[in-house]
Each structure stands twice: as C-alpha cells, then as structure tokens.
Amino acid sequence: PVINTMFAFAKIRGAESIYDTKGGLMHGPGGESYYAAIWANDQAEYINPFFPYLGYEVGNRSALCSYEHFARFMNPEYKPLPSSIIAEGIDVWAGAGDRGDAAMVAYGASRYALSKGDKAEAEKLWPLIEWCLEYCRRNLNKSGVVASDADELENRFPAGKANLCTSSLYYDALISAGYLGKDLGKPVAAYARQATALKKNIDRYFGGTVEGFDTYK
C-alpha cells in the first residue's frame, strides 16, 4: 500500500503541470509556478515515454510537442541540440554545452513512439531519432564511446570528456530505434551492429572494480 500510494502521488506530480503556451503544450516539473520551458532530460528523456502508459492525452500531446520543438534544431552540420527550449519556445539555454542531449532525445523519442503505438506519430518522429543517433555516432571518441562536454548534472560533479550516462542512453536508443524502425519498415541493421560494438566499448572504457564489485565508473 505504501508503494502504491507513493506511485499514485508520483503520477499526479508528473502530470499536474502542463501549460498551454504559445509554443504549444509544455510540461513543467510540477508545482504552481508557470514554467514554459522543456529540457532534453526532464521532458524528452524522463517523463515523455511515461505518458502513453498513463493514458493521459494531454501528456501525450505535450510529449509530441516537445519533440517537435527539438526537431527544429536539427541541422546538416550536426551542431549540438540545445539543452533546453525556453520562453514558450522562442529561446534556448545551452549553458553547459553538450550534455549528451541528442542521446537523451533519441532514447526518449524512440521509447515514446514504441509506447504510444501510433504509426503516424512514429513516422513524424523518425527523422529526429535518425538525426540524434547520427549525431552520437559522429561524436564517438577513439575508444568508441560518446564524447560530450558534460552529463545531466551539468558539471556539478566531474564527468570527464565522456560519461557513462550519455553512452548508455545512446546504446538504448540504438536498441529501441531498431525495434521501432523494424515496425516502420526502415533499414535498421546498422543500428544493431553499432549497439553491439558500443556495448563492448562501454565495458572497456567505463568498466572497473569498486570495493571488490565489478561495476562501472
């Protein structure tokens, strides 16, 4: 009962603050403050893939809206996506550099599309997913893991030039995009090969022993 109650409150907290802005429906972190901004982690990665399970159509619409905002920043030069799209969609924040934001969006958009099960929406999201995966591929370092300026903690703690979180998100995005692309009839064999190689590289680069336990660092 305690866990059920906690989860019930979490569902309310996760869905209570969605604002109808001039940039469309935008999900906020909860509470009573008007917060017309979206993040590659808070919305694209965390809450959006959950909304289809909640069955809350306003949440689903806000999720699609957020991905459409990030899709505006795809570019042929493969410059980083902004970390946050603010002020009802008319400005951005990228104060921590590349936090692995493309990996966050690729993971979240793939998971959202799989969970929602709407083919038309999935087709709309597919170019964004492809772009984000290609961005990550282009930013692999010599060890075959994704390089970035920071992680989601934005340098509150040292993250080095490559971090486990970003490469793990990219790995899951490759797997999830493979499932999604298969349903959509897209060529996805390369994603499976890239995921296999990335898994080995993650183990080599981040694997370690901490206090006698085989883990990651």
Locate each region found by the language model:
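Aromatic side chains
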Residues: Y34-Y35, Y112, W126, Y135, ...
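Catalytic cores of carbohydrate-active enzymes
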Residues: L81, N141-E152, R156-K217
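Conserved helix-loop functional segments at active or binding sites
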Residues: E16-D20, R72, P76, R111-L114, ...
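Substrate-binding groove/exosite segments of carbohydrate-active enzymes
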Residues: P1-E123, T215-K217
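Short alpha-helical basic/polar micro-motif
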Residues: A44, P127, S168
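Short, glycine/acidic-rich beta->alpha junctions
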Residues: N41-D42, L128, A162
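Extended, well-ordered alpha-helical scaffold segments
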Residues: T5-F9, V58-A71, D118-C136, A177, ...
